[in-house]
Amino acid sequence: MHNWHRQFLGRTQMPPEVSALAISEFFKLSGAELQAVLSRYGVDMRLGAALQIGFLKMCGRPLDKLQRVPAAVLEHLCAQVGGSPPDLATLRAFYSNAPRVLYRHQQSALDVLGLIRFDATSDSPRVLEAICDKVRAGVDADKLLAETRVILYERRYVLPAPRAVGELAKLARETVERDIGGAIERAISPTTRVRWVEQLFESRADGMTRLEFLQEPPGSLRTGSITRQSDKVRTLLEMKIADMPGLPGTERYWQMYAAKMRNQRRSRFAQRKEPRRSIELVSFLRHSLADHTDTLIRMVDRRVSQLWGRASKQAKADQGALPALTVLVAGVRQAINDQEHTKGERFDAIVDLVHRYDAGDLKPLSIAARQRALLVNQIRQIRPLLKSLVGLDLQADDASQWPALIGAWKDAYTRGADDLTKTMAPPKSKVWTMLLEDPNANPRNAAEVQLLWDLRQALRRRTVHIPTSLSFQSRAAMLDSRGSTAIAARSSCPVKTMLRELNEEIEHGLERVSEAVQRGELRLDGTKVKVRRLAAQRRPPELKDIRRELYKAYARVQFPDLIMAVDAETHFSAEILGRPADNETELLHLYAGILGQSMDLSASRLSLMVGLSPEGLAHAMHVLEDPAPVTRANEAILTFMHSHAIARTWGNPFDCAADAMSLDMPEYIWYTSPDPKRRVAGAATYVHTHGWQGIFSDRSIMITQRQPGPAIDGILGQALSKIARVYTDTHGFSAYGGSLGWTLGILMCPRLKNFNDRRLHVPSGGHILIPNNLKNIVLPDISLKSIEKGWAGHLKVADAVMSGRLSATTAIELQGAARHGDASFRAGHAHGLLLRTNDLLRSYTDPDYRREKLRYLNHNERTHQLQRQIRHAGSGSTRGKRQEELGAQSHCLALCTNLVMAYNTSSLQRTLDAWKRQSGREVDASIQRFISPMGFEHINFNGVIVFPFDHYRTQLLAPRWGVRGRRSGVIQPIRPGSPGR
């Protein structure tokens, strides 16, 4: 079922307006449906029967009242069943005079479509488990009602009355709560739960309760902020939350109930009834421990990268400043402090140093050695980081050195000891030996610096793990395939067959490159391949005039008008709320929340809009932090956009481009980094642009984060289109990521920076015939045996990613540079190098392929220009400290970008249709291919924000007696109650 179909389910009246997409989807009768209508009824009766069939397909309920039926629907049906469309009054009068005919038409439609009426007593058990699965997946409130209607519709039931749907959803929620509550009752004693409640609402020395302290978002990367984040984890560990036994339920379910504790008052919490009270308590505690633990590790990881990077930069800067003299001074100082030798021996050592200096034999320390020395001198910044990590609930294999090492350091920090015992000594390393044995330095400081780096790497490779974490669990737990049958798309392909076919492609590619060199199309310069610049693409001569006319036809529009115009076609607001808005106030708050998140508008700016309340705006912001409904809204907009004929000329629906765009953020947020180009602090949104245009996937990332993982995750996490190929830039590709993507059925096609300088990696051992003129640019260093040896482990990682147990981002981090000794990593890395070679060979000899890469990536850049125009105000709010807030900004920015492109696409199609209808003028598809929907010159994003409800009230608001049986005159907030209730 399309996401945009959900908005119609449960209606008993025809919407006042039905889009052309909905008419073609629901009121176009199939061959069997048309035959049934024509064979059963005469000309006068066919229209009513066909109308009932179309309405049942659209809404899942019979059409009871004919208060309104759009003329376009009647015309479309009459064109199929014959006859001329009557006016609505005639049709209504016909049914009023013959009520039995209405019933027969309804029953006939049920028979034709194979629908059965829902009986609550006998049919509820058949669908209850499916609805319970939705509850376990974290679906609640109005969204659960929408999912219940979808489940009933897909099982061919006639949707019952709203009250029956609500009772069914309530039964499913209570069933799951009873199961989870029973598990909590058996696993956690009432005394323990009472103690946890007392501790949560107990005040700290700073006046905050523990609940308020644990809900505080993380700060910057300063030592004080990291220490405060460590205090949150320590608070939860002291409450023995890590000892909580395993409980049923998905992480999304626990997160949903944990959110209900936000800003909770003790009096309100005491009024909660069991089992919900215990579920909310346990959910909050276990989710807080996992979330704060992950955040602390990420903060320490970023701080370590920051400190190591600064030290490296300083070491490089100091390298040219009298390096030999610096070594001489250090040697003289060491000789003077050497108390084990006599004064004469120390004097002779100094003289020897001076002679070596005069002879030029003194060599400075390497940059890496100077970097380590600088870090040891920064122990006041290093020690709090190590203390924060050691204080976590770290676990490791008993056979490794980590359990004893972590225990020794944890005990030393607890006792306040400042010595370095044998059990605290980190693993021996040649590069750290000099600092550990330097008599002028404190060996404990050097040991702490080394241990911090080693522990960071161990957490990355999961040799040290945390059972209560979400992202840093053990490698075995992450790759555990029990309970899942999902496998990677190419898991069934034998490795030998795959390598043979890939080798053949590479060999043919080398032949093409060799022939191109002989013809003079390519030139070799040592190990480089000189590729000619692409010639300007030939465009139809009439393109410029047609494009100008099409863009000139755009009507100048205010952004709020544009939002409501597209919402009237797609009903994306109903997707976000889980139902049509009840009144203008609710819809206004939702629109304001979307604008506030996408444009990062401050609360003072939003408060200028008439009719907003702080409580309603807070609710709207909270609703938008849930990514699932916003994703469905985006898909509804894209489905509408791609339904236009012009969109299908813009590219291939199985291709996409992926790239990141920076989002300006305040510097005091821990995950911000300076944009390398603009030197402005911010995070980034990683977007995937569809071949038919439009952003179908987006996610928030850090600017410094490697992007192959998000490039793969964005494709796997969407259901709009079956993407088989993704075009990326250099940052979006790595050898291992390319192999992982190929295994998952995604071919990564990178546009590499300086691709002329890239060596062509091919199999060693003579498996491929290398032309003589390409010997210098080909590097036969890939072992096919190593690929075959580690391929099974590589497929195991791919299967875990496909099943959702592991994200591609985490998998690439897990298998990354920290695991060079792992056979599965070596297999994936070597296979990725072969894929990169194959792509380079095609790029060298196929100009059309290179041009297609540039075209897709340029479209992505045009999309970023539109996003920057929408978000031109920069960081005007203080939101974004929590990951959910940053994700909401990314999702809403993609939503607004798609709104603009969908509006432009619809306008372009209307203009083309008007040309064809009025003068018979048609524009060839080869010309439409060059028409872009990303223009924004005709849109005013500034000024006073006013939404024209008078024009769209009937299309967007729930009917007087709508799906939920509630009168539209009653103002309902987006979520009932004030924040925290």
Question: Which residues fall in each region the model found?
Answer:
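Long amphipathic alpha-helical coiled-coil/heptad-repeat bundle
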Residues: 2-500
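Structured, charged N-terminal subsegments at the starts of enzyme catalytic cores
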Residues: 504-607
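Electropositive nucleic-acid engagement tracts
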Residues: 581-582, 598-652
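Active-site-proximal, Lys/Arg-enriched surface segment
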Residues: 627-684
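Acidic, metal-coordinating catalytic cores used for nucleic-acid/nucleotide bond scission
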Residues: 726-736, 753-759
